Amino acid sequence: MCTAATYKTKDFYFGRTLDYEFSYGDEITITPRNFPFKFRHTSECNSHFAMIGMAHIADGYPLYYDAMNEKGLCMAGLNFVGNAVYFEPKNGKENIAQFEFIPYILSHCDSVLQARKKLENLNITNTQFSNKLPCAQLHWIISDRNESLTVESTNDGLKVYDNPVGVLTNNPPFDIQMFMLNNYMALSPKQPENNFGKSAELTTYSRGMGAIGLPGDLSSASRFAKVAFTKLNSVSGDSESESVNQFFHILGAVDQPRGCCEVKDGQYEITIYTSCCNADKGIYYYTTYENHQISAVCMHRENLDSDQLCRYPIQTGEQICYQN
């Protein structure tokens, strides 16, 4: 399971946690402008916007989990098991395989507005990357500094939702997640007043009581509410270090330590990595379960006119600063 969020100070930030019980071997991957995307059902794209993100490279192809392009458009795919449905290619539609969806949108679109137009005639197909890599059951968040969308392909077809909170987790479907936020409308970062009854002399006995009722478990619906509340009430300076620091704290609200989410005997879901993209500067920051030091890759330090992928292995192993 996973959580994605947006955040804006003077720059725009986007990122996600990837929570799972194992890794496929992920790399920070820059796809330059002239890398050929050979889409399965539509024309090959040999010139496009450059992008950077976390990907598994299979047969030289970047299978992105999350990424941003050089124009500041960001996108992430999150588990949507049991609800995601993809279709056979359809005549008259722009047919894009599930694994192509992120590079297709980020190759062609410089904003959510453009992405919205692309989605009007899009069909996400059930074409597998290979027999060893079947379709992942996902839904997606697409964001820029102005707005966010959630995209879900279900039995009812392709659904595109405005996402006013800039947050996505997993099940249930996005419209239900948004509806359930009604349960928390009374929560506040401020201390509560006694509205229980005039005859009951009630007082606060702890800080933070305005948010009593905010979920703390690791279920996707609870993570959605907790990160939405945390993000919407976050306060930070607008420098790069302050903004990045705050973003990691926002997603840290739903960090998964090993042992708290057992998926089968002896196997536990953990937060494998957390990412934070500065979409204005093209910098991809990340931490991993084993390494809490923030690492970064800047796409603009590479040759973005190349036709070859630029790959950086994840930095693992805890980095500890000894002071004596």
What is each PLM-predicted segment?
Residues 92-128, 240-248:
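Proteins synthesized as precursors that undergo proteolytic processing into mature forms
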Residues 121-159:
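Catalytic cofactor-binding cores of redox enzymes
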Residues 1-9, 13, 127-128, 135-136, ...:
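C-terminus-biased signal that marks the final domain/tail of proteins
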Residues 18, 79, 144-146, 155, ...:
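Short, flexible loop/turn elements at secondary-structure junctions
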Residues 1-93, 126, 313-315, 321-324:
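A contiguous strand-loop segment
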Residues 15, 77, 151-152, 161, ...:
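Beta-strand residues in well-ordered beta-sheet regions across diverse protein folds
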Residues 20-22, 81-83, 156-159, 166, ...:
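Short, surface-exposed beta-strand-loop junctions and turns on beta-sheet-rich folds
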